[in-house]
């Protein structure tokens, strides 16, 4: 838009970092609350006139204000020298001050909730080193439901805002280090990415598909092997 203003924000946060030892288990817990007030939030609208090639043109403009607030929890525990566990969880709300239409073709579909902002997401990492040079790790990423815009095309006849499913992606990696010469080390590794096969099931197909209708983990279940040289 011709009169586009910069997006501004005011943010506040408070946190507590706690440490405690339960027997031989060393633990750490971080608790953080956050609040952000956004002004002149950027949004997109479709112009009536296409460009010279006939493509639809979307214009960035200043919408209403918005607020983002939530709670972040992160914990770490070292059970032994060979086993550590770390995990985090974020609970948040992201809303515009007033409901806005996410697509000009369906002005009746108005939402206060921001697109592609799940209310809940988190992660975990578990690392095992039972013997020297060998490491096994299991990691996971959780993404809660969120709103995603699905434009008209091969998938749907008219634009619709879709509530995506929850995803829990779990990965596993095994690695072993071989000393080749003095400080030169060769690592051989392999594993499985996205063991749970948490993956989008409703991709659009065809020439008129909505290429932006993509969400969730980037890859389905897959296997990998690799080598790395450290010195």
What are these model-predicted stretches?
Residues 8-12, 65-69, 116-122, 166-170, ...:
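Residues that define the transmembrane beta-barrel architecture of outer-membrane proteins
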Residues 14-18, 71-77, 87, 124-128, ...:
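Residues on the lipid-exposed face of transmembrane beta-strands in outer-membrane beta-barrel proteins
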């Amino acid at each position: 838009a011709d009169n586009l203003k910069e997006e501004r924000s005011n943010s506040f946060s408070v946190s507590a970092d706690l440490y405690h030892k339960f027997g031989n288990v060393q633990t750490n817990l971080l608790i953080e609350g956050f609040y952000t007030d956004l002004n002149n939030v950027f949004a997109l609208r479709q112009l009536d006139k296409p460009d010279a090639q006939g493509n639809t043109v979307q214009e960035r403009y200043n919408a209403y204000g918005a607020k983002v607030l939530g709670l972040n929890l992160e914990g770490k525990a070292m059970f032994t020298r060979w086993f550590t566990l770390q995990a985090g969880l974020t609970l948040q709300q992201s809303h515009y001050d007033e409901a806005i239409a996410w697509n000009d073709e369906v002005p009746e579909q108005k939402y206060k909730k921001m697109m592609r902002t799940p209310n809940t997401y988190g992660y975990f990492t578990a690392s095992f080193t039972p013997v020297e040079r060998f490491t096994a790790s299991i990691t996971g990423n959780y993404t809660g439901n969120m709103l995603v815009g699905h434009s008209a095309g091969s998938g749907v006849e008219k634009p619709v805002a879709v509530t995506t499913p929850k995803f829990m992606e779990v990965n596993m990696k095994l690695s072993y280090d071989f000393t080749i010469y003095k400080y030169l080390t060769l690592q051989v590794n392999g594993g499985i990415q996205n063991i749970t096969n948490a993956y989008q099931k409703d991709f659009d197909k065809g020439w008129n598909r909505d290429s932006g209708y993509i969400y969730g983990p980037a890859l389905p279940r897959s296997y990998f092997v690799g080598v790395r040289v450290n010195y």
